[in-house]
Design a protein with these regions (language model features):
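Aromatic-anchored segments of alpha-helical transmembrane domains
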Residues: 27-35, 83-88, 171-179, 275-284
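Membrane-interfacial catalytic/cofactor-binding modules of polytopic membrane enzymes
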Residues: 180-262
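Membrane-interface helix-boundary motifs at transmembrane edges
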Residues: 11-12, 40-44, 63-75, 152-163, ...
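Interfacial segments of alpha-helical transmembrane regions
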Residues: 74-78, 146-181, 187-201
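N-terminal transmembrane-helix/juxtamembrane module of multi-pass inner/ER membrane proteins
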Residues: 2-52, 71-146
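Membrane-interfacial alpha-helical segments at the cytosolic side of multi-pass membrane proteins
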Residues: 148-152, 250-268, 298-307
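Interfacial helix-loop-helix junctions of multi-pass membrane proteins
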Residues: 185-188, 244, 277-303
Length: 321
């Protein structure tokens, strides 16, 4: 397999599709910040961050023209994808000003299932042999993204830009939902209302409680497990009381599995066990209500189709000539 990573190539000028959609999301959320300026916690810093991201994007475009090759193209796209770790907690800065809706979703969950599956699951299976595989699956989320993207880069470079665009666009669609649908999930909501209320099926509204309280208590499972502690550490760093409905972990991993299936059945087969564990883990570690995960799965197909259509309709151009 001749990669020719550093071989100079003829390339089109301008922004890649994934950079364009990032700038569009950047602009849309900047406008939203201006509308909500008086209510937001640190709007000036958020706007400054967006200016830096836009400036960095155009700088990378310029530097790429000095040495256009597959590797520098990968770097440009990888940087945009890495910014998802910024855009995700950024959604909380918007939805923290809206009344929390967890009481609605917990009540629907109670009505549909006669209780809380997120509580049942971890209470019935607290042992290491259940906890560790599920936490491993949950932690595998970002490696799964990396594996699919790198596979397309190495083996189907002609589809690399499309795949990266669809992934980032799908994330942005979920993020826009999270901005306007403030649901934190059981891991934040249940400690806030107390276990007695949960056991009795009473789910009070907590208003803007998470505007001032973002503490995340240790989750359920085998507390001495290696993967349990990996998940706990990553959540303490990057998790916020946001993004529960629908589950982007389930939704995006489903999008990735669609891409894996279309690209390589062997890749799909290798990822499938981790995918199943990841989906189960969203409820097991109480990151999501079961309805979040179900809607995440169903929504993935529509979002994949929409993002693919957007690429073909407005953004499709060959990266290299």
């Amino acid at each position: 397999m001749a990669l020719d990573l550093f071989k100079r190539v003829e390339t089109r000028k301008g922004l890649f599709a994934v950079e364009k959609i990032t700038l569009i999301y950047n602009l849309l959320t900047s406008i939203l910040i201006l509308f909500l300026f008086q209510e937001m916690d640190h709007p000036v810093q958020m706007l400054a961050d967006r200016v830096v991201i836009a400036g960095m994007t155009f700088l990378l475009m310029y530097l790429y023209r000095l040495a256009p090759c597959k590797f520098s193209a990968f770097v440009r796209i990888a940087i945009q994808m890495s910014l998802l770790s910024y855009w995700y907690p950024d959604t909380f800065e918007f939805n923290r000003i809206f009344p929390n809706l967890d009481h609605v979703f917990a009540s629907v969950e109670q009505w549909m299932f006669g209780g809380q599956p997120a509580v049942w699951f971890c209470e019935r299976f607290p042992k290491m042999w259940v906890s560790e595989p599920f936490n491993m699956g949950y932690f595998f989320y970002y490696p799964m993204i990396l594996l699919v993207v790198v596979w397309y880069f190495l083996y189907r470079f002609d589809l690399f830009e499309k795949v990266s665009f669809v992934i980032v666009t799908a994330f942005f669609i979920y993020y826009l939902i999270y901005i306007f649908v403030p649901v934190a999930g059981p891991q934040f909501y249940f400690p806030a209302i107390g276990s007695d209320h949960v056991a009795q099926g009473i789910f009070p509204s907590i208003g803007d409680y998470f505007h001032h309280h973002q503490e995340l208590l240790p989750g359920p499972g085998y507390e001495h497990g290696f993967f349990y502690n990996l998940v706990e550490s990553s959540q303490q760093v990057g998790e916020r009381p946001t993004a529960a409905f629908p589950s982007s972990h389930v939704g995006m991993s489903t999008v990735l599995m669609i891409m894996a299936w279309r690209g390589s059945k062997r890749l799909f087969a290798c990822l499938f066990p981790f995918y199943l564990l990841l989906c189960g883990a969203t409820v097991y570690i109480q990151a999501h209500y079961l309805i979040d995960s179900i809607v995440g799965f169903v929504s993935a197909f529509g979002i994949y189709i929409l993002a693919t259509w957007m690429f073909k309709r407005w953004f499709a151009q060959p990266m290299l000539r």
